[in-house]
């Protein structure tokens, strides 16, 4: 892939402009014309390097309850388990990982769900013939920022910024805007034109509301998401660490400061699960990933840790917020 395409990909992951002609804005940064930029992006999309470009919303701030969940499933039951888990509209990620707890997925339920998160997990556990399950909600988030360093120029460590959010009450228009902005944008000169026409609003109204949603932390960012493997990031390791409770926050922040870490959380422990810090590491090779994790261990002085590489991706797609599919799924069990 050309250096210019790598620069474009990194920029679109970090700062996609929200204006009437975002591709024009971006093209000026790279000293190419708008049509050439759109053509390059279309080629990257066709090659399946770009997954989608859309708003990324905060599940919790929208009132949804969510958790990471792990199942221990016998090899003969994996196919059945995957079918059951993937059928839930609140499952956005589902992976096979190298561990006795071998199926790992994220699950979200709506604010008005008739079933609790635990009840939903139990239904999926029974459908999956899982032997054991653990529910690992976020107790503290240290970092969430999926940005693949396609340029090779990003520093090994980064400073984390603490953000304060203002409270807003979602209006019916906000909900309609969220429904629209969560979709992949069309690759054309005015990608937001269809939205303002459907909602019968102006560009100014759309971008003002989007800014409000960002200031409230409801919309984390508007960005391009890549297919990690297609973009050359073939090693996807979930590193898990046993940290002393009194130092968990300090050490979580230290793990999160590594640029190769996209997500870093504090989660609960159980008799059958002793690790409380989770840090997702993305690298081009397992050797590179292992070296990063070794460096993380050295800096934190943590000795009890392991890494769970994903060996198969069963599902990776955005949750469709305010979708009727959640209610439809629940109605089978109520």
Give residue spans per PLM region:
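A compositional/biophysical signature of low hydrophobicity enriched in polar/charged and small residues
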Residues: 1-334
């Amino acid at each position: 892939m050309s250096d210019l395409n790598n620069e474009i990909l990194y920029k679109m992951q970090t700062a996609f402009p929200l204006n009437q002609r975002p591709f024009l804005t971006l093209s000026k940064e790279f000293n190419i014309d708008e049509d050439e930029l759109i053509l390059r992006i279309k080629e990257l999309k066709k090659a399946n390097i770009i997954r989608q470009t859309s708003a990324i919303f905060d599940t919790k701030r929208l009132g949804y309850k969510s958790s990471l969940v792990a199942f221990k499933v016998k090899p003969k039951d994996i196919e059945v388990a995957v079918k059951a888990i993937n059928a839930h509209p609140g499952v956005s990620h589902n992976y096979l990982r190298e561990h006795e707890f071998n199926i790992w997925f994220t699950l979200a339920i709506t604010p008005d769900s008739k079933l609790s998160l635990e009840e939903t997990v139990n239904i999926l556990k029974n459908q999956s013939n899982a032997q054991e399950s653990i529910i690992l909600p976020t107790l503290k988030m240290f970092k969430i920022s999926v940005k693949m360093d396609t340029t090779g120029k990003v520093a090994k460590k980064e400073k984390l910024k603490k953000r304060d959010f203002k409270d807003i009450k979602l209006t019916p228009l906000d909900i309609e805007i969220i429904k629209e902005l969560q979709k992949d944008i069309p690759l054309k000169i005015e990608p937001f034109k269809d939205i303002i026409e459907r909602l019968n609003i102006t560009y100014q109204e759309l971008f003002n509301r989007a800014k409000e949603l960002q200031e409230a932390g409801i919309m984390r960012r508007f960005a391009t998401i890549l297919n990690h493997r297609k973009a050359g990031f073939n090693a996807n390791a979930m590193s898990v660490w046993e940290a002393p409770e009194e130092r968990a926050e300090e050490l979580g922040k230290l793990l999160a400061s590594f640029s190769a870490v996209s997500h870093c959380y504090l989660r609960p422990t159980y008799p059958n699960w002793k690790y409380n810090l989770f840090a997702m590491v993305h690298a081009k090779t397992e050797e590179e990933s292992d070296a990063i994790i070794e460096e993380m261990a050295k800096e934190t002085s943590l000795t009890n840790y392991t890494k769970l590489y994903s060996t198969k991706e069963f599902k990776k797609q955005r949750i469709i917020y305010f979708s009727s599919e959640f209610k439809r799924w629940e109605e089978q069990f109520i």
